[in-house]
Amino acid sequence: MNPAWALLRLASPQLPIGGYSYSQGLEMAVEQQRVNDQASARRWISDQLLLNLARFEAPLLLAHCQAAADQDWARLQQLSEEHRASRETRELYQESRQMGYSLKQLLEGLPELDSDARELLTHQDEPHLALGWALAARAWGISPADALAAWLWSWLENQLAVLMKTLPLGQQAAQRLTSELLPLLQQAQHHAANLDPNHHGSAAFGLSLASMAHERQYSRLFRS
């Protein structure tokens, strides 16, 4: 089977885990006029990529995928607990939990998941997204590096979809923005892959504040 198909499957917006329901604070940034055009949108996404994802979320996800590939189940469980504890707001916690639960439901019904991974997943009451993503990558024969690339692409694609729904930003403008951001996506992946685990961490105060404010946003399209 063509290995690209598995990668496209993992990165697809049709993966039934509800990622389209969440904006990760971007909807509130638009509401507050911090993001109001293509330039400010590029700045917001760039900052999230290089100051948050590249320094913490991406290396943590990569570590999940590597532990799953190595069948280091104790390490994977430890990383999952760290991921769960690192969610800074209620909405970000609920987002990761809901998407992880949906991925668990999907994987449990598929034949590709091996018995050891299935047993680990079965005993997870609240599997978060990173754990499910790592097990999906293992089940579909996707390398940790490619699984991280798929996750970063899915994140970027979702952020652009949010912008097209909340700003006067059309599909062609979104594609131009994609061209501008792809080098940063590559930069984030490279940084995550080479970062010392002792230096994993970020201080994304703007994201946290936007996420907390979104809980009280009067009219909204997204759940985070």
UniProtKB/Swiss-Prot annotation:
It holds the Pfam family UreF. The keyword Chaperone applies. It comes from the Bacteria. GO terms for molecular function: nickel cation binding. Gene3D superfamilies: Urease accessory protein UreF. The keyword Cytoplasm applies. InterPro entries: UreF (IPR002639), UreF_sf (IPR038277). Required for maturation of urease via the functional incorporation of the urease nickel metallocenter. Belongs to the UreF family. This is Urease accessory protein UreF. It comes from Pseudomonas fluorescens (strain ATCC BAA-477 / NRRL B-23932 / Pf-5). The lineage of its organism: Bacteria, Pseudomonadati, Pseudomonadota, Gammaproteobacteria, Pseudomonadales. The gene is ureF.
